A protein has these predicted regions:
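Conserved acidic, metal-coordinating active-site core of Asp-based
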Residues: 65, 72-188
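Active-site phosphate-binding/coordination module
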Residues: 2-99
Length: 188
């Protein structure tokens, strides 16, 4: 790819913290559009090129609205992180935080816990909402009117999990951003 000047862009809904094992297996260091387009990350320079985040005030309003509509829901956030250096426990600092009332419904049991209010103290790439009593489609019907147009609701599995992000954070929009900005060019 590098010899032919063909850029490699990895686009995924997965968080940045999941990607080092992927790019370490590749012959080139790719650009990574991750967290559904909330981040553009240069794996060669180990640098976040662009963030499109939900701001603290927006997050607070969104969490409160959803919590009123779905009091049984559990919350977590994916933050953008400063770099890709782990603190030794496999987690990047401040990346994935779980509201303390939600321990049993998240697969990442070693992730740090915090209060529901503290989830929205800093901007986040994604707000995750889990409700085991409803399907994701049922949840989306309830949540979309509460967050539109401030945020965008998506889900990839119908098991009661929603991902909420900034409305401009999409993989397609970020790919176009990379191309127009010239970040798809061959890198050293």
């Amino acid at each position: 790819l590098a010899e032919r000047h063909i850029p490699l862009i990895v686009a995924t809904g997965r968080p940045l913290r999941w990607l080092p094992p992927v790019w370490q297996q590749l012959p080139v260091s790719p650009l990574c559009i991750c967290m559904n387009g909330a981040l553009i990350y240069d794996a060669f320079r180990h640098k976040i090129l662009r963030r499109t985040l939900l701001q603290s005030a927006e997050l607070t309003d969104i969490v409160q609205s959803i919590h009123r509509a779905l009091p049984e829901a559990c919350f977590a956030v994916e933050r953008s992180g400063a770099d890709t250096q782990s603190q030794g426990d496999g987690h990047l600092p401040g990346e994935f935080l779980i509201a303390e009332n939600a321990e049993e419904v998240w697969y990442e049991q070693n992730a740090p816990r915090t209060t529901l209010a503290a989830l929205s103290e800093e901007p986040a790439a994604k707000l995750l909402v889990r409700c085991t009593e409803l399907s994701s489609a049922e949840m989306a019907e309830i949540v979309r009117p509460l967050v539109d147009p401030v945020a965008h609701v998506t889900y990839s599995i119908d098991s009661g999990l929603l991902e909420i992000s900034h409305p401009l954070a999409t993989k397609g929009k970020r790919w176009r951003t990379c191309w127009i900005a010239g970040t798809c060019r061959r890198r050293p």
